[in-house]
C-alpha cells in the first residue's frame, strides 16, 4: 500500500513539474501583442522591451522557424523600428527595418526603410 501511494505521489509531482515547465515557456506572439498594446498607448520603452524579447526568443537557429514564427519575428523587428523612430533613434530604426525586410520582405518594410534613409540624409545635410 505504501509503495502504491509513493508511486502516485511521484506521478503527481512529475505531472506538476511538467505543467510548471510549460507555464514558464515564453510565447513570442504574446510579447508581440503586448508590445503593440504598449506602442498604441505611447509607452515606447515598454514596447521596445517586448519587441526585443521576441527577437531574443527567436535568436537560435532561424532556419528551424515555421512560417508563422517568421511572421511574428518580422513584425517584431518592424514594430521595433517604428518605436525607435518615435524615440528619434534613426540609426537603430534603420537597422531594425532592414532586419525586418530581410526576414519578411514586404512593401511596408521597404517604405519604412526609404523614409528613414531620407530622414537620415536630411539630418546630415541640415
Q: Residue locations for each model-derived region?
A:
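Bacterial Sec signal peptide processing site at the extreme N-terminus
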Residues: 23-40
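Flexible helix-coil transition and linker loops at the boundaries of alpha-helical arrays
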Residues: 57-70, 106
Amino acid at each position: 500500500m505504501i509503495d502504491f501511494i509513493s508511486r502516485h505521489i511521484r506521478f503527481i509531482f512529475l505531472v506538476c513539474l511538467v505543467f510548471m515547465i510549460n507555464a514558464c515557456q515564453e510565447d513570442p506572439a504574446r510579447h508581440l501583442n503586448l508590445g503593440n498594446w504598449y506602442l498604441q498607448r505611447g509607452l515606447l520603452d515598454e514596447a521596445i522591451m517586448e519587441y526585443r524579447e521576441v527577437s531574443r526568443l527567436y535568436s537560435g537557429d532561424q532556419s528551424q522557424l515555421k512560417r508563422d514564427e517568421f511572421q511574428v519575428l518580422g513584425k517584431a523587428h518592424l514594430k521595433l523600428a517604428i518605436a525607435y523612430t518615435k524615440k528619434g533613434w534613426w540609426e537603430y530604426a534603420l537597422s531594425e527595418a532592414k532586419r525586418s525586410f530581410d526576414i519578411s520582405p514586404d512593401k511596408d518594410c521597404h517604405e519604412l526603410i526609404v523614409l528613414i534613409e531620407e530622414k537620415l540624409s536630411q539630418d546630415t545635410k541640415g
